[in-house]
């Protein structure tokens, strides 16, 4: 779409959780930006082309803050567009696939590549290397708990050079000597400034991690606990009640993120925490090649699972728009629908009817699900593509 072209979305139910707006409105897009919102814009701007979205929900562009999309730097990454614009999601965030030593190459190969249509941002690992080529994941190389992998000076330079796309750190809280302290978490805290730290909650293959109690105590307001709703992570006590450390962390401003993955989201745990008021701040997928065909599938499917556990539709949309933007320090540019903002817009529909959701371990019945129809990314329309599961059917 050139700067001179314009399009009107008409007939949709526009929900902008940031402003509380929920109304049937038209949206005028000119070039890369939203120019106007209101009734009957398709009549006021007859020169604009029209996209009829009657029966659909129109939201700020969805944001998935935990994915793995650095293809070529690990055997488990997915192409960014497969989990991004092709799934109705204009913005995805890679969660720690790269450390400082590889980030420049990954930015050129993935983030800034002309074939990448999705906006890709990144949490980086505080280590120099998290992954190596040929599928040698750090779990196998055992560099995740080797302090020689830390180079604070290099990491500081990379943060400065790539400030436009690095939103914070993703930390696996492994330890070396003292089982109560992760030098990798401490390194991230010393470098992060006002950037958030996303912490991996739970076990880590082949390398020891500090206890959940110590992890939560070390986090700052604005930091993010991903995999917050996994089973056996120390967020519930033996009586099934939220522990004091998780309550205290949330009270001081730590954010809870779903980070579904293959085995890091557990319906019974999530239901209990949500019933007790510990609702996700953000819903993310941790999408990678091992869970794309199931149980995760897509961001819309993951949002549907949270919706089925009690939060309202507005709450679920809020988690992946304004809250996701705020969590990564981009609330000034992303996560809202208003004139002069970049035209990142997601279009969804609700499929009514009994639905069986899977978390990879257990199943749960819901009454409806969200399905992506497509999205605008900076004013360009991308229809949602069939999921691999649908193509195989």
Name the predicted role of every residue range.
Residues 59, 110-123, 190-194, 249:
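Alpha-helix-loop-beta-strand connector modules within alpha/beta enzyme cores
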Residues 171-293:
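Active-site core of metal-dependent hydrolases
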Residues 41-48, 53-113:
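Metal-associated gating/positioning segment near the N- to mid-region
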Residues 12, 27, 32, 55, ...:
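Divalent metal-coordination and catalytic microenvironments
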Residues 342-392:
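C-terminal cap of metal-dependent C-N hydrolases
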Residues 1-59:
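Histidine-rich, glycine-flanked metal-binding segment
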Residues 81-172:
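Divalent-metal coordination cores built from histidine and acidic residues
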Residues 268-350:
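His/Asp/Glu-enriched, well-ordered alpha-helical/loop segment
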């Amino acid at each position: 779409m050139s700067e001179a072209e314009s399009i009107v979305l008409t007939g949709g139910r526009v929900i902008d959780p940031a402003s509380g707006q929920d109304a049937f409105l038209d949206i005028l897009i000119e070039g890369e930006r939203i120019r106007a919102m209101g009734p009957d814009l398709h009549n006021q701007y007859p020169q604009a082309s029209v996209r009829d979205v009657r029966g659909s929900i129109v939201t700020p562009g969805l944001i998935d803050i935990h994915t793995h999309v650095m293809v070529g730097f690990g055997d488990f990454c997915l192409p960014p567009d497969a989990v991004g614009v092709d799934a109705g999601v204009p913005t995805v965030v890679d969660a720690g696939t790269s450390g400082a030593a590889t980030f420049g190459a990954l930015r050129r190969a993935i983030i800034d590549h002309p074939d990448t249509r999705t906006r890709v941002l990144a949490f980086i690992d505080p280590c120099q290397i998290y992954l190596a080529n040929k599928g040698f994941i750090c779990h196998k190389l055992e560099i995740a708990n080797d302090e020689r992998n830390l180079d604070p000076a290099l990491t500081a330079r990379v943060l400065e050079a790539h400030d436009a796309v690095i939103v914070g750190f993703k930390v696996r809280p492994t330890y070396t000597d003292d089982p109560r302290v992760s030098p990798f978490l401490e390194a991230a805290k010393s470098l992060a400034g006002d950037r958030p730290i996303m912490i991996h909650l739970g076990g880590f293959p082949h390398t020891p991690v500090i206890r959940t109690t110590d992890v939560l105590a070390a986090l700052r307001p604005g930091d993010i606990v991903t995999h917050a709703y996994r089973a056996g992570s120390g967020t519930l006590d033996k009586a099934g009640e939220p522990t004091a450390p998780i309550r205290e962390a949330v009270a001081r401003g730590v954010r809870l993120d779903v980070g579904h993955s293959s085995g890091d989201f557990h319906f019974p745990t999530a239901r209990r925490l949500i019933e007790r008021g510990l609702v996700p701040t953000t819903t993310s997928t941790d999408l990678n090649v091992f869970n794309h065909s199931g149980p995760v599938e897509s961001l819309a499917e993951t949002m549907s699972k949270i919706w089925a556990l009690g939060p309202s539709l507005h709450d679920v949309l809020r988690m992946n728009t304004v809250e996701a933007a705020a969590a990564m320090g981009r609330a000034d540019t992303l996560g809202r629908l208003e004139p002069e903002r970049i035209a990142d817009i997601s279009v969804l529909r609700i499929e009514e009817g009994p639905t069986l959701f899977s978390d990879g371990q257990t199943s749960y019945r819901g009454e409806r699900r969200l399905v992506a129809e497509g999205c605008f990314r900076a004013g360009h329309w991308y229809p949602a593509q069939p999921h691999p599961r649908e193509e195989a059917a």
